[in-house]
Structure formats: C-alpha cells, structure tokens
C-alpha cells in the first residue's frame, strides 16, 4: 500500500460539497463515493473506476469513451442477440449498483445494424431491456460526433457535414472582404471546412457517390 495509497487517500477522503441556490448556502455534505470533478486527476481516476466494467460482460464487445459505453453484439439469429444483450445489460445494471453508479435511461438506446433486407425482416418491436425496463430503439445515432445509421450508408452524417459547410460558405461570401490574403482564406478553410471532412473519414469514406448527391 505505502505512500501512493496514503497520497490517494488524502486526495479522496473527507471531501465535502455545498450547494448555493438563490442566495442560500446548504449545509456541508461529506462525499462517500465518486471522483471529484474539475481536477487534473479526476478523469484518470474515473477511467480507473470504470476499468473493470467489461469483466461483467459475457457476450458483448464494449467500447468505452469516458462515461459513454457502446455494446456491440453480432450474430445470425436475432433472438440469440436479444438474449445475449439483455443478459449483459442486466450484468451492467448489477455492476453499476455495486459501484454506486446510476445508468441514465434517457440516454440509453439501441440500434440494429445490417442490410436493408435483413432489417426489414426483423420482428417488431425488438425487445431490449434493463431490469424489465424497455430501451428506446433508434435508427440512427451519434457516436463521437459521427452519425451512424442502421445500414451504414452514412447519408445522415454527410447531410450534417453539407449543412455545416454550406453555412460556412455563405458566411464567407458575406465576410470575404475581411480576408486580406489568399493565405487567410486557406487557413480558414483548413481549420473550419477540411477539418470536418478529415474527422474520422477512415470510417465513413467508403460511402457511395449517391451519398453526395
């Protein structure tokens, strides 16, 4: 245990918080769990806090980014996939309870991915749930600023990119006289427009020409 343990203990133990609302200050409350926010060590400690969550999964493949968790489960039979996901979601619920964390059901959703023909043949509704509480089904979702749809066509993502860059184009047309040189225009383009096209393009640049129509 030694010095590192004492150092972390002094950092985490006996932390208190108060709320100030409408000119009134609450009593001091001692924090018994969790990681302090607004600190340099906070994000690292939070990752360590969540680090063993995948150990409770039996079938799904987790992808974790801070407090966002994506589960992927693949298979040929929809009922087998449902059973595997529901079992792992129940395991996650137990893990969160044991670690004094709460799942935000308003941000919890699921999406089926496959060919258009296979998705059309899926039973409706698909029953994915946590503790008998149904999870909302979506047909496109945002993951790390990438819009993903069930057919992986990337049409929705490209549509968002087009709208953003159209806004930039009209803004530039209105204010282009403020750019005193061609280099200024180039730097603005690289920073505002091309950065959108470059972001994660290894994921979505396999889309067909029709996606840009």
Task: Label the predicted regions.
Residues 1-35:
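Conserved pre-catalytic core of RNA-dependent polymerases
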Residues 23-25, 87, 102-140:
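Short, conserved micro-motifs composed of acidic
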Residues 25, 43-72, 180:
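Active-site palm subdomain of RNA-directed nucleic acid polymerases
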Residues 38, 42:
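Short, conserved phosphate/pyrophosphate- and ester-handling motifs at nucleotide-, phospho-/glycolipid
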Residues 45-49, 85-88, 161, 168:
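Hydrophobic alpha-helical membrane-association signature
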Residues 58, 69-97, 206:
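Catalytic palm subdomain of template-directed nucleic-acid polymerases
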Residues 58, 132-203:
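Basic, alpha-helical interaction scaffolds
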Residues 200-212:
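Charged boundary/loop elements
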């Amino acid at each position: 245990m030694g010095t590192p343990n004492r150092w972390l203990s002094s950092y985490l133990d006996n932390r208190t918080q108060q709320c100030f609302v409408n000119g009134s200050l609450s009593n001091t409350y001692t924090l018994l769990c969790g990681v302090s926010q607004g600190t340099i060590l906070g994000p690292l400690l939070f990752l360590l806090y969540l680090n063993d969550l995948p150990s409770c999964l039996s079938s799904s493949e987790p992808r974790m980014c801070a407090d966002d968790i994506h589960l992927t489960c693949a298979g040929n039979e929809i009922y087998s996939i449902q059973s595997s996901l529901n079992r792992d979601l129940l395991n996650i619920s137990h893990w969160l309870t044991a670690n004094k964390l709460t799942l935000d059901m308003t941000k919890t959703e699921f999406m089926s991915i496959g060919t258009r023909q296979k998705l059309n043949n899926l039973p409706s509704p698909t029953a994915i749930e946590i503790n008998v509480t149904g999870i909302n089904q979506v047909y496109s979702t945002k993951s790390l600023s990438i819009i993903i749809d069930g057919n992986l066509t990337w049409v929705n993502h490209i549509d968002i990119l087009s709208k953003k860059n159209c806004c930039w184009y009209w803004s530039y047309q209105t204010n282009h006289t403020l750019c005193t040189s061609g280099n200024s225009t180039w730097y603005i383009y690289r920073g505002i427009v091309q950065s959108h096209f470059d972001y994660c393009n290894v994921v979505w640049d396999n889309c067909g020409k029709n996606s840009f129509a």
